Swiss-Prot record:
Residues 249-411 form the PCI domain. GO terms for cellular component: COP9 signalosome; cytoplasm; nucleus. Component of the CSN complex, composed of COPS1/GPS1, COPS2, COPS3, COPS4, COPS5, COPS6, COPS7 (COPS7A or COPS7B), COPS8 and COPS9. In the complex, it probably interacts directly with COPS2, COPS3, COPS4 and COPS5. Interacts directly with inositol kinase ITPK1. Interacts with CAPN8. Interacts with USP48. Interacts with ASB4; this interaction negatively regulates GPS1. PROSITE patterns: PCI. Residues 456-471 have a biased composition (Polar residues). It comes from Rattus norvegicus. InterPro entries: CSN1_C, PCI_dom, Rpn7/CSN1, Rpn7_N, WH_DNA-bd_sf. The modification Phosphoserine is found at residues 448, 454, 463. Residues 445-471 are annotated as: Disordered. This is COP9 signalosome complex subunit 1. The gene is Gps1.
Amino acid sequence: MQIDVDPQEDPQNAPDVNYVVENPTLDLEQYAASYSGLMRIERLQFIADRCPPLRVEALKMALSFVQRTFNVDMYEEIHRKLSEATRELQNAPDAIPESGVEPPPLDTAWVEATRKKALLKLEKLDTDLKNYKGNSIKESIRRGHDDLGDHYLDCGDLSNALKCYSRARDYCTSAKHVINMCLNVIKVSVYLQNWSHVLSYVSKAESTPEIAEQRGERDSQTQAILTKLKCAAGLAELAARKYKQAAKCFLLASFDHCDFPELLSPSNVAVYGGLCALATFDRQELQRNVISSSSFKLFLELEPQVRDIIFKFYESKYASCLKMLDEMKDNLLLDMYLAPHVRTLYTQIRNRALIQYFSPYVSADMHKMAAAFNTTVAALEDELTQVILEGLINARIDSHSKILYARDVDQRSTTFEKSLLMGKEFQRRAKAMILRAAVLRNQIHVKSPPREGSQGELTPANSQSRMSTNM
């Protein structure tokens, strides 16, 4: 029997969109304190949309935080949601009368005053920028664009904020200014979830001399910048479902320099990096890059549950590992960046556990295997069928005896293939050595053009000698 599976129609690849969390164990105040600015408000709104028990509390906190900004439109939207949530709570059949259930009234005086303040500040910043342009002072113009971008961001106008931050690029006079511009653009692009833009500006920042030319020990400021860039790149790779790349990015973050509350917290780095690594790393990579990583261990100390899951997985204690994963699933579904990937990551982690369990054996008793994974034999058989169809395990199932058999590999053919590949590699190296010897014997030197010099002129310093060799 042959089964064709269309990867685009595979439910495991579909993002988790329609879900409701009824039993959260999240400390909302502690959670919100880990973030700042728009990210704090966005995350609280995400929790309110998907967790009825925390909806009113999350919206009240978001309403309080948004009043510290100029974002009047978001204030009105959150207030509307809070009023609806409160009415639903009061009309619930099992509702208990409580004091303080009524939402605070819409503060129209604050709305009008804030709108006027925002408009006055915008006019002042715009006038200042015009004056700077009239004086043709690059540094002042750059700061003027940044100030305008900050103001638009505070007002919730992300498109104009992005334009202002991007315009500052033409007035950057040092690598430090370019990096600052890139970080501003990256931050707004994350809010807009424009992930290709995020990766583009991460690459631009990493290619500046201040970052690219440093080797060995980096100073504290450079480490802080690199950590921000790696965290932003990790979010972009996670959104693109490139989990292995995302894990590598998060693993490169420095714990002592992880201070980016506008986007994510150190706890997020531990959870995102840990789960992506579990889903994609093999046993050796997990041991080398996660368990033995002195830097990432510090992140894992903030999330003991994730740390224990990784160690249980590495120790092949799959039942307890998968049980702990299920226990923290509700909280993960309340994370706005991780939630769409929870089901896929969990499936990949479980599949990797099945592969790791079976890899040393020629055959395995499915009854014992089901006990090890805390599941039924029938459910395990369905899982193994899917894993075999995807080509993750080269095996066959004896449904009558409930035994999983590894398919025999033709060792003779494999040895011949390896020998041929090795011969081709030796041949390539021998040709390269002969070419190098010929170049040295004939004293041929290829000089690169100098970094600084007149363009378009051919001088002896940047002329090149070439030799074509027909091997």
